[in-house]
Amino acid sequence: MPSIEDELFPSTPGKFKIDRSNRQLHRCFASTSTMFLWALFLIALTASYLSFQSFVDSGSRYLTASWGGIQWEKQVRTSAQIHRSGGISVLVTGATGFVGSHVSLALRKRGDGVVGLDNFNNYYDPSLKRARRSLLSSRGIFVVEGDLNDAKLLAKLFDVVAFTHVMHLAAQAGVRYALENPQSYVHSNIAGLVNLLEICKAANPQPAIVWASSSSVYGLNEKVPFSESDRTDQPASLYAATKKAGEEITHTYNHIYGLAITGLRFFTVYGPWGRPDMAYFSFTRNILQGKPITIYRGKNRVDLARDFTYIDDIVKGCLGSLDSSGKSTGSGGKKRGAAPYRIFNLGNTSPVTVPILVDILEKHLKVKAKRNFVEMPGNGDVPFTHANISSARNEFGYKPTTDLETGLKKFVRWYLSYYGYNTKAKLVH
């Protein structure tokens, strides 16, 4: 009898059949905001090293004591071992995060080598990340506890293992949190990204890189559905600005150093083992506790809509991107030819309004929500998202298969199990 973890983690982690008959590579061209973005990049790097110097110093002292040594190297090598013909060896950053844990398990399930990296920060309850790490460990995946800005740690990992690929999912997430702690976004999403790229460019051989951008880069764009070629020069939040800056930075490293890089613009990912700061997660918690939930509305009381994308579909897109990533062409920091640079949307293509999402949660929780409708504040949120996924479909056969009704049913089942609710008992009304 399969466990609930087996049932709720991705069940289709195999390679995609890649249709190359209509292959398209999507280049990131300079927009009218290029000067602004480079200015943001330079200011951000300066701010990160000034504002976070004490943080990095103290963090480095802690990390120095938590990695290294013969036993540690053995664990890293063992976890990175490939167990299938034609397999890959992947460093997954943010491995105990929501998407990172699912991707790591899917890679391991099909026989790839996987080593995780995570700093276990307290943006949300670290106990959930540690529970994910326990699950990864039970599948033979070793997760290194360390910070993306620790260059010595990253260099050591690449010294121990010649990774063929990097799946970069570590980032400071969330739109509203940027109003409270903007420096954390610079530290993780810009300085951390540059640090990782510096290590990858110097590696020999260089790995191919797939990394998580975000649908938030479309910002205030009103054209729908969003396509990769649409304008992305109107960020609505600092989070979006750092992700757009990341796209410009990765393009530069591809151009100068020959790194094969694929950026993935995720659209509102949800599912089991998700992030507690996401609306569907907090709605579930508050509904079960009998607390009111806040539902934002746009101008003229228009309901907000999101292209909610189930985690299994995102995982399939991540693996398809890895399998079709191509090869980096540099060696020891020197470019020897052009390398692929691609950007893809990964969404569901079927936007659903937030009130309908709440309707579905009520159905599966068997509890009515106490709804409080308020006007959307100017805190970085956007009124709608809608993905055009034709590029990912043409390049590596990406095809989402889970609708919101089915996906939320799986999430609710996991939530009730993980947090110890007795579904046979009368829930709080």
Swiss-Prot record:
Q: Which GO terms describe its molecular function?
A: UDP-glucuronate 4-epimerase activity
Q: Which organism is it from?
A: Arabidopsis thaliana (Mouse-ear cress)
The alphabetical list of record keywords is: Carbohydrate metabolism, Golgi apparatus, Isomerase, Membrane, NAD, Transmembrane, Transmembrane helix
Instruction: Note the subunit structure.
Output: Homodimer.
Name the source's superkingdom: Eukaryota
Listed name of the protein: UDP-glucuronate 4-epimerase 1
Q: According to its UniProt record, in which tissues is this protein expressed?
A: In root stele, leaves, siliques, flowers, pollen and stems.
Topological type in the membrane? Multi-pass membrane protein
Query: Which reactions does this protein catalyse?
Result: UDP-alpha-D-glucuronate = UDP-alpha-D-galacturonate
